[in-house]
Structure formats: C-alpha cells, structure tokens
C-alpha cells in the first residue's frame, strides 16, 4: 500500500470502502477499493482472486480499468482508474433535463462496454447508475464489472444499505440461477428509460413482490405462450393478468419512436427475447449517431 497515498474517502461501495488516492511514483490519481470479505479467517478465496485477475485483461474505453490487485494478509485492495462522478450524481446535477443527444451517447457507450465484456463471457449482473462512471470528457465507463461473479451478488451492502432491485429482470426476481448476458440487457433498458427521464427510475420497487408488480403493470403480465419457462422458475408465483400499457409515450415522453422501440426490445420479460448489446448497437435509434 506504500505505493499509493490515500487522499480522501469517496464513499461506500457494494463491497467495501472506496478512496481517492495518488500513485506516489507516477502521481496518477486512482480509486482504491478495499474489499471486505465475510469469512475473515479464510482470507481471500482463490476463486475470487482468479476472477479478479481475469478482469485486469478487460481493456476498453468504456470499462473502468483495473490497474492493480493488492493482496495482503486477508485484505484485498483493487486499484481502479479514477472517474469524477457516477451517473446518479450526474443526474442530480442536471436538474431534470438531459439533452437527447447525451442520452443517446451515454446509452451507446453503455452498450459498447457491455458488448465488449459479453463477447468475453463476462457479465456484470448488478448494473445501476451508481456503477456507471462519467469522467470530465463525458465518457461513460462501467465499474465493478465481474465483481458479482467473484464475490457473489450481495443481498445488502455491508453499510446496511439494501442492494437495489430496481434494475433486476423478472427472471432473476423469480429466482433464476442460470444467468446469461440478458440480465445486463434488462438493466440497460431500465437505465435507458432513466436517462430519457433525466434521472427518474423506471421501476422503483420496495421489495421483490412490488418490483414484479411494477414491471407487469407496465409491460403486461407474461402469458405461458410469451414465456413458457416462467412457471418453472424456483420462486415463481402467479400475478394478476395486467394488460400491457399500449404505448410507452407517456412513460418516456422525451424519447422518440425509434428510441421507444429499442427500449421495448430491451425490456422483454422473457430473457430469450431480449435484444443483445451487439444487436442494440445496430438499432435504427443510433443510425444518425456519430460516436465521438
């Protein structure tokens, strides 16, 4: 740890405390994540270390770079590139108004980062505005990629803050254990709607039951035809047959028709029907978009 000088505490992450720090040799500013591990007597599980070391190979401009892994007596510190703010803070500063071109640019960058990781079979599993970071140049980067696989998706942050369900797809809420890239695509859809509404969450549920009700009230309760395997999921229980909202115009009033079409393709209750990151990048919504 002598290599880095701690400057200030940034906050509490899902897995531990985050500090802003400086590399004493290069003077580069970095973010240090001290990972708290439950079974202190065991130290760091070797499976977690293997996973984390794989993440050092994920090099993409829309993924927060993992520079270094410091492992000493039962402590694990991850050294990440530093970004100025997360999307949640960004929303707070934009006063309920977000330029449609910025919405498009942020979604494009989110999908680029997802597509890159998915092509390498790395899932995020816990995407939310708090782990989408934005730097001074308006570049969006995905943070905490792959950590859910290494450490498990926590039920609550160790700071006792409950981990949000707002971005979890219906299959996961029904207890699906086999995750695929589709879990991240649902979260991307929720974040897209939140971008379009300048920071208003789409499905701010209080618990699993409330979360599923909010989803089905908007998208319609899936039928056996639409989602044949739904009733076989471990925590499945029937819900009232809510009809689908005919149009998303009132839900995302500032989003144009092609944007609404893309959103509908991301928010499919049946994970098999959800569009992939690569497919989403080819969607007409981006036809007039010039990446910077």
Swiss-Prot record:
Name a GO CC annotation attached to this entry.
membrane
Phosphothreonine modified-residue sites: 17
Q: Which GO terms describe its molecular function?
A: acetylcholine receptor activator activity; ATP binding; cyclin-dependent protein serine/threonine kinase activity; ErbB-2 class receptor binding; ErbB-3 class receptor binding; Hsp90 protein binding; kinase activity; p53 binding
Phosphoserine, modified sites: 72, 159
Catalytic activity reported: L-seryl-[protein] + ATP = O-phospho-L-seryl-[protein] + ADP + H(+); L-threonyl-[protein] + ATP = O-phospho-L-threonyl-[protein] + ADP + H(+)
What positions are modified (Phosphotyrosine)? 15
Q: Which UniProt keywords apply?
A: Acetylation, Apoptosis, ATP-binding, Biological rhythms, Cell cycle, Cell division, Cell membrane, Cell projection, Cytoplasm, Kinase, Lissencephaly, Membrane, Neurodegeneration, Neurogenesis, Nucleotide-binding, Nucleus, Phosphoprotein, Serine/threonine-protein kinase, Synapse, Transferase
State whether keyword Iron-sulfur applies. no
Which positions are annotated as binding ATP? Answer: 10-18, 33
In its miscellaneous comment, the UniProt entry states:
Dysregulation of CDK5 is associated with neurodegenerative disorders such as Alzheimer, Parkinson, and Niemann-Pick type C diseases, ischemia, and amyotrophic lateral sclerosis.
This protein's assembly is summarised as:
Heterodimer composed of a catalytic subunit CDK5 and a regulatory subunit CDK5R1 (p25) and macromolecular complex composed of at least CDK5, CDK5R1 (p35) and CDK5RAP1 or CDK5RAP2 or CDK5RAP3. Only the heterodimer shows kinase activity. Under neurotoxic stress and neuronal injury conditions, p35 is cleaved by calpain to generate p25 that hyperactivates CDK5, that becomes functionally disabled and often toxic. Found in a trimolecular complex with CABLES1 and ABL1. Interacts with CABLES1 and CABLES2. Interacts with AATK and GSTP1. Binds to HDAC1 when in complex with p25.
Q: What is this protein called?
A: Cyclin-dependent kinase 5
Native organism is: Homo sapiens (Human)
Q: What is the lineage of its organism?
A: Eukaryota, Metazoa, Chordata, Craniata, Vertebrata
Q: Which gene encodes it?
A: CDK5
């Amino acid at each position: 740890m002598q290599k880095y000088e701690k400057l200030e505490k940034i906050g509490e992450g899902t897995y531990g405390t985050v500090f802003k720090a400086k590399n004493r040799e290069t003077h580069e500013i970095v973010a240090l994540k001290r990972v708290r591990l439950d079974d202190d007597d065991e130290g760091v599980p070797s499976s977690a270390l293997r996973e984390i070391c794989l993440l050092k190979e994920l090099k993409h401009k829309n993924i927060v770079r993992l520079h270094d892994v410091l492992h000493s007596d039962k402590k694990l510190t991850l050294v990440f590139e530093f970004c100025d703010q997360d999307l949640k803070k960004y929303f707070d500063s934009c006063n309920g108004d977000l330029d449609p071109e910025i919405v498009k640019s942020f979604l494009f960058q989110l999908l680029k980062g997802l597509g890159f990781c998915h092509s390498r079979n790395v899932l995020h599993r816990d995407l939310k505005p708090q782990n989408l970071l934005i730097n001074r140049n308006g570049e969006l980067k995905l943070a905490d990629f792959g950590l859910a696989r290494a450490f498990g998706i926590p039920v609550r942050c160790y700071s006792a803050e409950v981990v949000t369900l707002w971005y979890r797809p219906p299959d996961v809420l029904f207890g699906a254990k086999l995750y695929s890239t589709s879990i991240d695509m649902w979260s991307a859809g929720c974040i897209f709607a939140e971008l379009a509404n300048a920071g208003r969450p789409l499905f701010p549920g209080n618990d699993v039951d409330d979360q599923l009700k909010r989803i089905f009230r908007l998208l319609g309760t899936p039928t056996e035809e639409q989602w044949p395997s739904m009733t076989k999921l471990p925590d499945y229980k029937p819900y009232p047959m809510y009809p689908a909202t005919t149009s998303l115009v009132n839900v995302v009033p500032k989003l144009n028709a092609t944007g609404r079409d893309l959103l509908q393709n991301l928010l499919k209750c049946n994970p098999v029907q959800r569009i992939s990151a690569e497919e989403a990048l080819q969607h007409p919504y981006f036809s007039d978009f010039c990446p910077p």
